[in-house]
C-alpha cells in the first residue's frame, strides 16, 4: 500500500536563497533568527529557553538549515542522529507567494509573473472598483490600500459595521483581500462578493493569484478577530499537478486538510477537510492518515506559522508553534506504514525578525521519512518540484516536466 503524507509548515524557511537580492531578502532566515532569539532569551513570552525541536532535528532539520546557511542554528543540536532524508530546496518560480510555492511542490513551477497592485494608497483601478460596487450592489467600499489584515480591522472595522461597506486591501503578494464582519455583513454575502471579484479580476486580465475572503467578528476596535472561515479563490494551476495525475491516471485519492484545496483551486482534490488552528489541523491530519487507503496523498497546510506568527512578526509565537508541532510529530510518524512516505516542507519563508510584514525568499526544508527511506543528505535541490517528481515516481504516474526524483 502506497501513501504519501505531505505537511507544509507554511512560511518555515531555512535561509535566504541565492537570488534573495532580487526580493530585498538577503540575510533572511526564518528558522535561524527564531533560534537565535530563543537562545538569547528574547522569545520567552509563553515559552522559555533555546528552541526545542528534537523530533524535527532527528528528521534532519538542523542539517538542512546548515546546508542552506553554512551554520548550525543557535542552541540546536547539529550532531544529533538523523533518521530521515533531508534537503534544502530553491524556488524556481518567479515569486515568493503561497500558490507559487505549493504549485511548484506539486511539480508545476510558476514561470510567469503574477500581477500586483503595487500602489500603497488607492491600490485598485477605479474601473474594477466601480464594477464590484455595481455588480454586488454595494453602498461603497473602504480601504483600497496596502495593509496588514489585523491593523486594517482596527482602523476600519467599526466604520464597516456602521456602513456595510466592505474593506478592500492588498499586500506585496498577488492578492485582492476582502474583510467583512461575519454577522453584520454575512458570510455568504462575503463569499458571493469574492466570487464576483474573482470573475472581474480574471476577465479584466489582471493576473491576480488569489481573492481572499477575510471574515471577522467583534464589536469594536481592539477586539476584532479574524475567524477560521477564510476562503481563498485561486486561479487554476497552469498544468496538471502530481495531485491531478494521481487522481486521473491512477484513480488515486488526494485529501486536503486546511487550505490546500483552495490553493489548488480544487484541482486534483478528492476530499476536503476544514480545520482551524494548529492542534485542530493536526487532529484532522491524524484522522485522515488512519483512514487513508492505497494510492492516497494526505496533504495538510499548517497556515498559522505564516498568518498568525510570520506576517505578524511574532518570534515567540512562531517558536511556541514550532515546539507544539514538534511535540506532536511522533503521533504522525507512528502512522507511517511500511511503504509510506512522510514529507515535511514549506512553501516560502516569512522571517518574523525581518522588516515589514511580507514573505521572505528562502530555501525550504525537505524532510522525508519512511521505513524504506535511506537516511542522509539529499543536498541542495534546484526546485521545489523535486518533491512533485519524487511523488510522481513513487506513485508511478507520468513524469512531471520539472524536477528530479530524490529517492
UniProtKB/Swiss-Prot annotation:
EC number: 5.4.2.7
Origin: domain of life: Bacteria
SUPFAM superfamilies on file: Alkaline phosphatase-like, DeoB insert domain-like
GO CC field: cytosol
UniProt KW keywords: Cytoplasm, Isomerase, Manganese, Metal-binding
Pathway(s) served: Carbohydrate degradation; 2-deoxy-D-ribose 1-phosphate degradation; D-glyceraldehyde 3-phosphate and acetaldehyde from 2-deoxy-alpha-D-ribose 1-phosphate: step 1/2
Location(s) in or outside the cell: Cytoplasm
InterPro entries noted in UniProt: Alkaline_phosphatase_core_sf, DeoB, Metalloenzyme, Phosphopentomutase_DeoB_cap_sf
Cofactor(s) required for function per UniProt: Mn(2+)
GO BP field: 2-deoxyribose 1-phosphate catabolic process; 5-phosphoribose 1-diphosphate biosynthetic process; metabolic compound salvage; nucleotide metabolic process
Catalytic activity from the UniProt record: 2-deoxy-alpha-D-ribose 1-phosphate = 2-deoxy-D-ribose 5-phosphate; alpha-D-ribose 1-phosphate = D-ribose 5-phosphate
Details of cofactor binding: Binds 2 manganese ions.
Cystine residue pairs: none
Main enzyme class: isomerase
GO terms assigned for molecular function: magnesium ion binding; manganese ion binding; phosphopentomutase activity
Cleavable signal peptide: none
Sequence positions that bind Mn(2+) 2: 306, 311, 359
Family per record: Belongs to the phosphopentomutase family.
Function: Isomerase that catalyzes the conversion of deoxy-ribose 1-phosphate (dRib-1-P) and ribose 1-phosphate (Rib-1-P) to deoxy-ribose 5-phosphate (dRib-5-P) and ribose 5-phosphate (Rib-5-P), respectively.
Name of protein: Phosphopentomutase
Organism of derivation: Salmonella paratyphi C (strain RKS4594)
Gene this chain is encoded by: deoB
